[in-house]
Amino acid sequence: MNSHVPRKRLALLISDPSADYSQSVITGVRDQCAKYDYDLLVFSTMVKMCHPDKVYLSGELNIFNLINYDLVDGVLVASLALVEDQVKEVLEKLEADLRLYCTKPVVSLDLPFADYPTVYTDDKKAIRQVVKHLVNDHHCQKLYILTGQKDYVVSEARAEAFCEQMKAEGLDGSKDNVFYGNFWYTGGEEFANRLLSGELSMPDAVVCANDYMAIGLANRLITEGVKVPEQVRITGYDATKDALYNTVSITTYNPDVYGMAASAVNLLHKQIEPGTAVADVEMLQHYGLRTGVSCGCVQSADDLRSLQGSGMNPNERSRNPDGSLTVNDMQGLHESYMFETLSVIQDKKQILDTITDVTYLLQPYRRFYLVLRSDWSDTSIRCLNGYPETMRCVMRCIPQNESESETERRYAVDSEGHTFRTKLMLPALDEERDEPVVFYFLPSHFSDDTIGFAVLQTAMDAKRTADEVSTLWLRNVNNSLHMVRVVSKLIDYSVRDSMTGLLNRRGMEMMFDRRREQVAPDDSFLIWVIDMDGLKHINDNFGHEQGDVGIITLAEAIKSISDKEDIAVRTGGDEFVIIASGRLTEQEGRERISRFERLLADKNAARASRLFDISASIGCVCFSASEQDALDEKIREADHRMYEYKVAHKKQRND
């Protein structure tokens, strides 16, 4: 009897996992989950909510429709990462889903969300320390704050902290020094224009409520000849990599997002397992003020080392003993020529094999899964909202330095055998593991058309999360899958008859050559040649539309008597071919002819007020797969037998 008890699981809903804020949230949640032996399921878009292409964004957001809340024990919603300019459509949709489908406890992060409890980062403490630094260390007297959108809870909280600390310092803490932006580069640029035009007097310092506005403000002023920090000091907030990399590095504040996220896990834990011990929340060393050049300080040594050792520096890389990357290395991804390698592939099987070959770029990871719709390669079928009832796990990758087991093997194959009910999300969730892990569920789509989703499984203590490299890696995969779909469609157009959907002569030759390589030496081929009777008479007397009806009806009969693996072809205006292979005999060829005759008679009988009967002549030839005769020669032989059939039936009708 299996005594395995599944771990408890938390779901984290977030956006753009490579963003600094999201990275801090994920790390804080992950580390605290490890203390409780919880698995963590991260459901995330790969872009921010402010992504300019809203059609593309809708394809990203579909990942949240995958969540089966019955399979998790608690839900964390990173609400601050799921809004744009106070537009809360995504949160409103999530709230509706949670009300309908979720009976588990829910906690919001950093932004009020419905009536769920919210855990906040202490913005006020951070802004106060920034003001103290400017006033006490740089002797600034006249300060402005550039915050986010007016009446937005985060904007107002940071503005309020600014005013309170200004008053505590004995300076002007009135609302006259509060200005509103948009939490983006453009907000800083627009504020710079107001300073440059003289609409606003130049202050000693501007406290920006996030790094993006600080960068926009500083760079715009510098472009117009204003010296930063000599003429005006500028600070940011959030401690993003962009602030660190900026030409004039931005003095910023690293808020304790990590601690906030860990505290949110504790709040869920109290509801999931009431009365049990609550784990301590660790304090990270890098939390607090991070000085840069923009305020007049020297950039901190820790930040310089971070810049030197980052993945943006091709000379400093951390690797595993096998040479694979262990940290974010964008340069390594570029040097892999992954996109170029994938973009030339036209075959569905080959694309899966090649994707498997480049999963080394994701290391260190535990497992990688690619889950696709069973009809993913058909561009005429679109999936815009939600997922089909069943999905297909076409790929399970295990790092090359790890051995397979009897129950867990590597594979990359689009097979019905790997189909599962979508509500399970991923069958591997229930596999027994010695330690808790993280599953990152990320969207696989092209524009708004969902192809499937990817799952990156990592250890709880892995340095890698779903970072810039892994999200760009998956974007390359998504684009290459779509390219295979498009190429397959173009090839399909070139090898199929548009009227009947049967293969054309080119398609027949291509498929026959492929089939000849696949069959066993003791197999046989059966070829039927079919010719519609009296097509010219029908066209001349009843019109070409009726002639087309006859051709389509005949094609339907041919499809009906053809097996799934048969090659069914329209070779000309009124000429058709069927090619079958396997352990076949001439007797089966004759039986198929009898079925065809009966089926065609039934179709004629079913046609209401028919002006004419549809008839056809058919001939068949059977030959060993080991014969080397050309296809055309065998078709001519079957065509000769078809002609004998036609003559015999014409004589029979005349008699």
Model-inferred region functions:
Residues 424-427, 435-445:
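A short, aliphatic-rich beta-strand micro-motif
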Residues 567-570, 612:
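A short pre-motif secondary-structure segment
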Residues 544, 590-597, 608-609, 621-655:
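Catalytic-core segments of nucleotide cyclases and related cyclic-nucleotide turnover enzymes
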Residues 1-54, 59-336, 345, 525:
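Bacterial carbohydrate/catabolite-sensing allosteric modules
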Residues 462-482:
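Amphipathic alpha-helical "output/dimerization" segments
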Residues 337-341, 486-505, 511:
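Amphipathic HAMP/coiled-coil signal-transducing linker helices
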Residues 504-526, 533-560, 569-573, 577-578, ...:
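Conserved long alpha-helical elements within nucleotide-processing catalytic cores of c-di-GMP signaling
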